[in-house]
Amino acid sequence: RLRYGTTRELLIGMKVVKADGTVFSGGAKVVKNVAGYDLPKLFVGSLGTLGVLVEATFRLYPVPEYSRTCFAGFGSLGDSHAAVQSLLNSDVVMTSLEHITPALAEAVASRTGVFMKRGCYHLAVRIANVEKAVRDQVELVNGILGRHGAEVYVIEGGDESSFWSEIRDLPGGDAEEGRAVCKAGVVINEVPAVFKALEM
């Protein structure tokens, strides 16, 4: 599990207007809520098909004081996926983890200036916490990825911010005309098969 979890895990309460105009309020404006079904999570998963979200209450965390992103390039999808599994089974507390295809790596590198090896699958691992904790975690990530044959490099500051902004906003406004943009949930073990299918 990544550091902050998903939207549904951060949601405490919400107000939704349903298709018939009725208003549904669910959850509570406190962290502890154990009464009845947790319908707000159902509305989050519906992606707007069950009603229009008009109000939401979220659990907040302070902005970490220190952040670093580790990059590693892999010659094959199998190697990069094995590294993902090792990271997820480790004690690393990741803020973000991105598994990047060669085509996406090329696009992101051209827009941000962040170095990525051509033709490689990449992993980007973001660690954010107090300085000592980040340094210790980066060292742990370096060891894990190094055991999978990857050369790891670290970015920070403006380069790090521009990279994650680009990843967040993909595919961006310059996506090819006529292309559809889809969101899909994939079981981690099936990621290599999905990548391969999309690259065909």
What feature does the model see in each segment?
Residues 1-200:
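Noncatalytic alpha-helical scaffold of FAD-dependent oxidoreductases
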